[in-house]
């Protein structure tokens, strides 16, 4: 671990193509953290299978996600980049924490309730219920100080803290108590068609989201079709959520403040503004897209990054899990 550096853990599921919401909300912020913190950036493939995945698609998206991390500026020399399933300690720790969790507290999780409604016709898997316990294990085995999360994940961080404190008080001091880290930069990117909802790749309307790998002509089309209003003024206000969302996208791409954007487009209407938002987004994404495509031609390199990352991650995680096993009364295998 980096000397005297605080530890950060975060991850993204390879359960679908990444949107610009994933990029601006998570990955771009992670890049800013890598010099100041000891960062563990994971591809959380175990979380992905709480909902059925096609095996070949899961493998393809996992490699693409690793390539996207690196192409976006996450340096494998400075950070630990690894695949969750390559470190069995995640599942070992989850089982021990699972046995200290209560069904009531897990079933009260907002995300579980929301996803249960979605899958009630096909049957709700136990993985959906236990998902937050695996997330707690992910964080605690690296003795993470901070966890970059969106506001929709703060409930899971609270559960992680509760489980850490429960284990510490039942046995003895084992885990650091992590805190959620909500970055000050960036913005929550909303749906282009329903701007009061978060942008999601699972939307039925493909015009509502932009993928990191969308080509320029698709980005231009989706921004041109983005919902605005009949006010006709580029203003950053909750009364104009569609315009506000496009302003956030432009601000994330260019670094311009929303006040500067308002001033620049005063009296211009939406057509020129939308064209410029699309151009700024294309300029931001094109170098990443090119680098991703280049990296995907060298799968051996990507797998080597993951192998080295898993070795480093396992060294730290196994130390924590050994402590957990000893404290609950397991006989540790002879080395």
From Swiss-Prot:
Keywords: Aminoacyl-tRNA synthetase, ATP-binding, Cytoplasm, Ligase, Nucleotide-binding, Protein biosynthesis. PROSITE patterns: AA_TRNA_LIGASE_I. Its main location: cytoplasm. One of its GO terms (biological process) is tryptophanyl-tRNA aminoacylation. A motif ('HIGH' region) lies at residues 14-22. One of its GO terms (cellular component) is cytosol. L-tryptophan binds at residue 138. It is found in: Cytoplasm. Pfam families: tRNA-synt_1b (PF00579). A motif ('KMSKS' region) lies at residues 198-202. It comes from the Bacteria. GO terms for molecular function: ATP binding; tryptophan-tRNA ligase activity. The keyword tRNA processing does not apply. It catalyses: tRNA(Trp) + L-tryptophan + ATP = L-tryptophyl-tRNA(Trp) + AMP + diphosphate + H(+). ATP binds at residues 13-15, 21-22, 150-152, 189, 198-202. Its EC number is 6.1.1.2. Belongs to the class-I aminoacyl-tRNA synthetase family. Homodimer. HAMAP family: Trp_tRNA_synth_B. Catalyzes the attachment of tryptophan to tRNA(Trp). NCBIfam families: trpS (TIGR00233). This is Tryptophan--tRNA ligase. The lineage of its organism: Bacteria, Bacillati, Bacillota, Clostridia, Eubacteriales.
